[in-house]
Amino acid sequence: MDASANRAGEALRVVEDAVRFVLEDRHLTELVKQLRHDLAALLAENDLLPRVFLRDASGDVGATVEAAAALPRRTPTDLIAANAARGEQALRSLQESVLLLAPRFASRFEDLRYRLYAIERSAIGAARAADCLRGINLCVLVDGRSDPSAFARLVESLLETGVRMIQIRDKNLNAATLVARTRQALAIARRRDAEHANESSSARGAIVLVNDRVDVAAALGADGAHTGSDDLPTVLVRRVIGPERLLGRTAHDVAEARAAVIDGADYLGVGPCFPSTTKSFDACALPEFLSTVAREISLPTFAIGGITLQRLDSLARIGLTRVAVASAVTGAADPAAAAEALLGSLAGLSGRSTNAVGGLE
């Protein structure tokens, strides 16, 4: 038990350091830290034998056993995965061993193990999402337009301008038309990928997401889906779209944002930040909520609701330099020019967010 306890504590410390210093995720850091403290408290409560005094490191037969070479650690994801697995195995060993001495404690070790499973998924997901969405600070929500030709012109013009993330969102489309528009957008994006395969990432096709209709996203092979806080739970959405596609989640308060992280979302949409011309809200999000999310959570986070070019500065001041927009682009006389202006401003803001709490203008 002493060896397993040491192994678990060491593994948790490595995971904590990785999410703290590499991912810079305050929320996950707090979760791992609390888990580590809960393990220490449980071990202290369950110290039926003075395990420190019974320790015999020099006489441990396992100390001289040579195992196969450890899996290489090439990325932060490798580091987190290896040490989370080490911690989970150690907690399982503790759970089984304590059944011989004090069975009443077994379920508590099991609870710690399942908490680590959830943290591992969230941390690895955060690292993957950060890589997938690196350099993407604008998501444009596109409607179905009046006909297929108008839709194709819109999508092509946005991609040509440099937009790399679009979300198909049109509550007025029937299922058949939504499927047709999604196929169009995917074909345009994939063709552009092929044409610009040897060029910089900024010249390549966009990530194509589907709003709400996770079934359409999965069936057509879209890059992901975005769901609201009142839609299917995140864990069920993940079952539908699979592990490889991006899963976005809207959060209206800190609790929803934290839950989305631990449930496996890849990115967040937070707000509404301002009154919107495309969707009605009971109230706008408080600046304190937006600032807390920007400060605590490392998942790519997009400000939503009433975003305009003139409002980007106030969002950057509270730490949000990614935005999702609809009418600011699609409702403009020249959508491509509107998108280009947003991209230019966001590029200048991305390095100087302050996380200050103040009013939004």
Regions found by a protein language model. Name each.
Residues M1-A130:
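Structural preference for solvent-exposed beta-strand-turn elements
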Residues L141-R145, K171, R213-D215, D230, ...:
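Active-site beta-loop-alpha junctions enriched in small/polar residues
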Residues V179-H196, S201-D212, S229-H252, F281-L309, ...:
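Alpha-helix-loop-beta-strand connector modules within alpha/beta enzyme cores
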Residues V155-T161, A187, R191, S201, ...:
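Acidic (Asp/Glu)-rich catalytic clusters
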Residues R164, R169-K171, S229-L236, G269-F281, ...:
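Glycine-rich phosphate-binding active-site loops on the catalytic face of alpha/beta enzymes
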Residues N172, T177, L220-T227, G248-R295, ...:
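Glycine/Thr-rich beta-alpha phosphate-binding loop at enzyme active sites
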Residues P76, R134-A152, R245-A251, A303:
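Active-site mouth loops of central-metabolism enzymes
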Residues V208-D223, H252-D266, E296-A303, I307-V325, ...:
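Catalytic cores of alpha/beta
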